[in-house]
A protein has these predicted regions:
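Short, Lys/Arg-enriched N-terminal segments with co-localized hydrophobic residues
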Residues: 1-6
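Short alpha-helix carrying the canonical HExxH Zn2+-binding catalytic motif
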Residues: 110-123
């Protein structure tokens, strides 16, 4: 029976360490700041290509590259046993950086049919850009809520600060409000793109073959 005293002692010691760590972590709460949020959209480019394999003669295709970057400006406070790492500012870049437009190889550049296909795909590009513009307020509010919900993180060593900032970044991006706003953006993009295709009867392209 006497042998059981050791694990009990270890358990008590472990609890003491846990409560000590929790107390230190709680000390960081007082250093929480109201985060400043900035959101910018990337400068975008358009590239037109013609795949060697034939596509749909009547429709082109747009591949949009989405940028979703978050730069955390951390507030780092040195305390007795380590450091408190919190959020001072989040500088986000959200939007489209590139549009790759694919046109069927049978449409020769600078011809009526080529230009007609490009004009249609340009409508899709404008809708992608307008969706991001329309969701600026929603993105700002969601990002603020996400950043404001993250408490400062305690680390013992300065070498762990970068890891704490990465953890903060992950918490922000996985926050429910950020997940939901991105789902709404994707859904709105799909609706607008389908509307463009539905409203286009192909008359502009058909005239090129008369």
């Amino acid at each position: 029976r006497g042998g059981r005293i050791v694990p009990r002692f270890n358990f008590i010691t472990l609890l003491a360490c846990v409560f000590s760590s929790m107390a230190i972590a709680n000390d960081c709460v007082s250093y929480k700041m109201t985060p400043k949020i900035t959101i910018s959209v990337p400068t975008w480019t358009k590239e037109v290509v013609q795949p060697l394999d034939e596509m749909d003669l009547w429709h082109g295709n747009v591949i949009a590259t989405m940028v979703d970057n978050y730069d955390i400006v951390a507030d780092i406070t040195s305390i007795e046993d380590g450091f408190c790492v919190g959020i001072k500012q989040v500088d986000a870049e959200i939007g489209y950086s590139n549009f790759l437009v694919q046109v069927d190889i049978r449409h020769k550049p600078n011809t009526c049919s080529y230009d007609a296909v490009l004009a249609h795909e340009d409508q899709h590009i404008r809708e992608y850009l307008s969706v991001i513009d329309d969701f600026q307020v929603g993105l700002h509010n969601a990002l603020y809520s996400a950043a404001d919900s993250v408490m400062p993180i305690f680390v013992y060593n300065s070498s762990d600060i970068d890891m704490a900032i990465e953890e903060i970044n992950n918490k922000i991006q996985s926050h429910p409000e950020m997940v939901i706003i991105k789902q709404k953006i994707k859904a709105d993009e799909e609706i607008r793109n389908k509307r463009i295709d539905k409203n286009d009867n192909g008359d502009m392209l058909k005239k090129c073959f008369i």
